[in-house]
């Protein structure tokens, strides 16, 4: 056996379709290989086969397949694998049982209670990973010194704890033995507060291993962080995936002599570090493959481009990964993959459902790319297997892919080349739809050629991929144009120039091994060992010594672990982190002090406080110096430097580059002659003028016109991107431009939201993301709205239009308006809307409006939180703004708005705002968000011209109108075909008996409808009155649900609809009426009535279950999940929020640590869903035990009238609110009340179930294979932001 330099080093990326092998051979030269990950006819394991081939070729010795390979010539093997990801996607992991604290058996099913898709009535959600649940009799509480509590114990965080009930191991033993007899051998153990008191989990784990369980994942070991829900999901994923990974590793080892005993074998983890194969676990493996690519460009492109920040762009067949590197890895500590939230360090790799295999559609006049994908089978149309038309087909039609450069592996026999003819045929069908649409309008437009249609889809795909890059950079205060675009992956080279140009980037860097950069990254990566523990300390001089002691202990653990792997101390470096947040907020940042040396006012490990303040300012634009800083976790990352040293350079070339051939590629101006070069024949110094194609074995690079490529010393390609030419289009409808403008308009609203979230200070806006930002036309009509909070959808438009009518000409540059009044389009008073007009030179009136609506935690009134259950007038609910100039002539009117916010204090029994500082800060943030919108609108007008931008504003509204008309026409046609009338109706009641009535008359010819709410009840004395804007929001939400696919959500959705709402009714009350319950309760009933009229689904729980708890010291508010209604083809989802709300619920451990309550139960309410061919979803049972005297308020519905069933389905069970006094007396509180509670009292909330659908005696169809959820999942911080934004 020779020295490591005389042996082979392999780095292997085992992907879902291909396995890439990168080998450094003896002598230092490199060999690369790409082969199919699955080819059972020829080999059992792709990585082993790749190693065999290279050893055979390099050594010139025949190595028969199937025999264990001699390892004497192998020094190391590094691998990234999608084994864990695929097992998660396909739900092919180990059989698992969940062991959880009694009372929480359904906690992971309920999760955050938010649904992933606001507008999908079926509420598709991933099934839990565990097969069975065992409730463990044990309970740990945070110590509060109540009488009879006993002596406290100290947790590892420093918190004092009360062991209310030790683990009953005797009772648990029999349950575990039962699991073993049923064939379950893997456990996830998740107990309340085990992040700080792990002893109970350890006792359970010891018993389970003694009984013979082969794998036990303790949540306190897998990820010791507070919040039981994500920690529980992580432990389940670990128990589900680790046995699968271990089996794969053992199978891989058997392919080698001695089972790789003398070979260093390392696997890439999700955090970008390598780990020994024995320490490679499921919860740390889901990004194993993509992480290699980030390491690859961070160690190559970043260095070669002089330390300029880099955006990684990895475009594959089904999705695209986007990431960022600026000198250090960017990690997230909670992210979802395949619907499972993992609480573990992961590189922030943002995956979007847009890739070469993304399908192309023409829908209601709009070019649509994805998110559906052709997958590997059948693949794109050009694969010759009958697949759909995709982005790859569009590129092939445009001449940007050359079939001759691909191997003949396509067709049923996998022996044919790519088929341009199949691509053209599939695209021609879509082109016919496009041209039919263009010919059908009142002013027929010019027909589009096949190439123009293909080009349109490519441009739309590019814009779709630009949006997450903008979000990833601008969300953290970075300018995307200041970055280099590092392009890798099989499909990215065809799009890199266009994407860089659209983002204003000057440079694209494509590594010479870009087609297998993930494998290269594995070769260059270091071995990492991390140690982390939770903490509960303030960041103050008094705690610095404790923090240093903890960090030193963790550092010692990391060093010992790395030295045990053979690293010397000189090869090991460590980096310390503190997970910090401001007191009273949830926004924690994991900060390193590497760039902030220790001072006399910091821990010895570094000035973490300065690092925190600097990063907080950069990401959010402000700091909160008056608040203390809290340490949630301490963490140390140890690195053993072990990456290979690659010295490849390219020879200087004196002659011109060799042109392999000249082909024809289609660009904006038509076909152009395009030289083709082979990457392997290019050398250092060669310069290539665009357009041209550069072909490699693994990728195709398109250098667009106006761009110039050069080969640099390392053999990489650097492309200088020319500036984007001015956009010369006219005001006539162009479906391609319509799709691009749809993205651009939405991007403006999204970026406004990013600025608002960054600069706001309150928890509601900054962390719960309870806000919306929107763009409006000169008439106040909605153009784009992001995100889609249902209750805001139609209401903001009413607000802007009211201000236009109210103020007339009294609106000038530098003015900003504030409004929340229900009669002015408001939903309820805490939702403050800030409106800014957009003026343009030469125009006397505003050309657009931008607005932001945010939920302020308090604006005064009779109760804290400004949501009183018993209000009878609007004034009791807080400060009222009909039309208020928040900024006048560019000056923020702080004194006047302060006076208005304090004005409710002048009313008997009321208070002014209880948090003026946050109100003012958030209002300034809303002004700043609007200003960003003005800037972006100005850039759009500057690029296209005012006439064009306003024309496409109208076109995009007309597109939404067309989609709704198509839906109404299809609904009417379906009824007519069945001999049914074109009129439908529905009626339901609020619990006080007030009817909500609806009659809908469909006009089949026009595709329009009249929605008539006549007959609805009168305005009520309480607060269930819903302003007209609420009904419009409910209607636009329902229309979007009924359309059933993504459409632009704007004014056009309501254009085909006439809405009749009687004045003075509960749906259009007088200006003085109380409305807080209308926003959160009546809105749900309106939705039930609309969907019931259309027969779309049975009633959902119809309630938000509003619960408020408060005293002089604290205040808490939550809304609670229930059952969703069943529909034609689906059972209702249990334990989820429905329709007009999607609020996430506070994690049980956070709830108990911050508020004086014990959460005794949070589980499903079996049998509460209505029976039917398809069952309604079950509600939940949530029981709170109080530890202090407080005022409990409940504001609920469906306590008298049951959620209806449809087509023979039975209704769901009514809700129930029970107060259980300490002495055992149980009282039914009714639907709406306030009551004083005392220590030991309990509140037990039973939420309603959903209605059933279809006759219960009709058997439901047998379940088929569960769909992958989603088949090509989005992930990363951008996705998590949008998911959180929609969960309000």
Swiss-Prot record:
Compositional bias segments (type: Pro residues)? 1259-1270
Query: Which GO BP terms, alphabetically?
Result: glutathione metabolic process
Q: Which domain of life is it from?
A: Eukaryota
EC number per UniProt: 3.5.2.9
Q: Where in the cell is it found?
A: Cytoplasm, Cytosol
Instruction: Note down the stretches annotated as region Disordered.
Output: 1248-1273
Q: Which Pfam families match?
A: Hydant_A_C (PF19278), Hydant_A_N (PF05378), Hydantoinase_A (PF01968), Hydantoinase_B (PF02538)
Name the principal localization, coarsely classed. Answer: cytoplasm
Q: Which GO terms describe its molecular function?
A: 5-oxoprolinase (ATP-hydrolyzing) activity; ATP binding; identical protein binding
User: Which reaction(s) are listed as its catalytic activity?
Assistant: 5-oxo-L-proline + ATP + 2 H2O = L-glutamate + ADP + phosphate + H(+)
Q: Which UniProt keywords apply?
A: ATP-binding, Cytoplasm, Hydrolase, Nucleotide-binding, Phosphoprotein
Positions of post-translational Phosphoserine modification: 1265
The protein's assembly and partners: Homodimer.
Q: What does this protein do?
A: Catalyzes the cleavage of 5-oxo-L-proline to form L-glutamate coupled to the hydrolysis of ATP to ADP and inorganic phosphate.
Q: Which family does it belong to?
A: Belongs to the oxoprolinase family.
Task: Spell out the protein name for this chain.
Answer: 5-oxoprolinase
What is the originating organism of this protein? Mus musculus
